[in-house]
Amino acid sequence: MTRLLMSFLLLPACLGLSNSAWAVWGKFISTGAGTSIGTPSCAQVATSHVVCAIRSGKYAIMVNEFNGTTWGSWTTLAGAVSSDPSCTSDGSGNVMCAATDITGKLRWSLFNGATWTTPALVTAALYSEPSCANYTVGQVLCVARNATGGLAYTLYNGATWSAVKNLATIAISHPSCTTDNNGGVICSLYTKAGATLANRYANGAWEGFLNLTGIAGGEPDCTSMNQNGNVVCFAKGYASGVYGNRFFGGAWAATRWGGYGAMSGTFNDNAGCTSHTAGLLVCGATAVTDNAFYANVWGGSSWSGWSKIGGSGTGSPACAPLGTGKVVCVMKALNNLITSVVGP
C-alpha cells in the first residue's frame, strides 16, 4: 500500500546535520535564574506572548513569560510535584499548566495573560506526567498513565474538571497529546516492543487505539499542523534518530497515518516541534555530537534539513509559536538553566 507520508518525511541521508541556517534565527538568551531538573513546556498566550513552565530542583513548578524580546522572572507556584509540567492554550486566551502532584493528584493552574490562579488539585492516581491539550474553546483534556499501565484522563470545561476516568491499554511511556485544531485531541504513547499507539478524543469519546508500529524510545511528541485536523507525532528511534508520523485528518483509521519516516541525525532526546504557520512546522533538537541546538523546518513540501543554530543543551527543547511566523524554543542548558532562541 502506498504510504501517504512518502513525500512528507522521508529524507535523503545527505541532509544530515547542516551548519547552514535555513532562515534567520536570533541569538540564544537567558530566561533568568530558574533551574530545571526536567523538560520545559511552553504555550502561546497571545501574539508575541508565551509562557513556559519547568520543574525546579525543589519539586515545584516555576513559570515565566516571554514578550517576544525579553523574559520576565521565574516565579514559583505553590505545591510540590513529582513530574514535569504540561502547558497548553485553552483556545480562549488562557494557558493551562498541570503536573502530577507528589500525592499522585493532578495539580493545575490557569494563566489569564496577567496572573496565575492559585494551584488546585484534581483527585486522581497518576503514574506519569500529564499531557494536556486544548479540546474545544475554553476546554482542556489532560491525560496520564494510571496505576494499571493504562490511561487516566479528565476534562476541564472552563469552570470545573470531570471525574477522572480510565482507558484500558498498555502504556510504556507517558502519553503526548495535542489538539488537532479540528474539534479533537490526538494522543500517542509507546507500548510493548516500542510500537506506537494513537487515539483520538472527539465528540466526548475516545475513538479507539490504532497501532502505528515502529520501534521507538524516549518519549513521544505530537503537535498539530493547524490545518484540516493534521497532526504529526515524533519519536526518537532506538538508534537516536528522530522519526515522524503524520495523520492527515479525516476518519480515524490507520490508513490516514503515513507511517514513520526518518529525519536523519542523532540526538540526545526527541525533537520538540510546533506549527508557526498553518501547515508548516519547526522542530528543534539537541545533537549527540556537540549538544548544540539544531532546527529543521517543514516548508509545506519538504524539510530544510537540520541546521545548527548554536547553544549547548540537553534533553528535548520546547517550542511555541509567537503568532508572527516565528517561534521561541527553550532548552535546558548543561548548567540546568533555561536558554531560548527565536526563529526562523
Show where each model-derived region lies.
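Positively charged n-region of N-terminal signal peptides that target proteins for export
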Residues: M1-L4
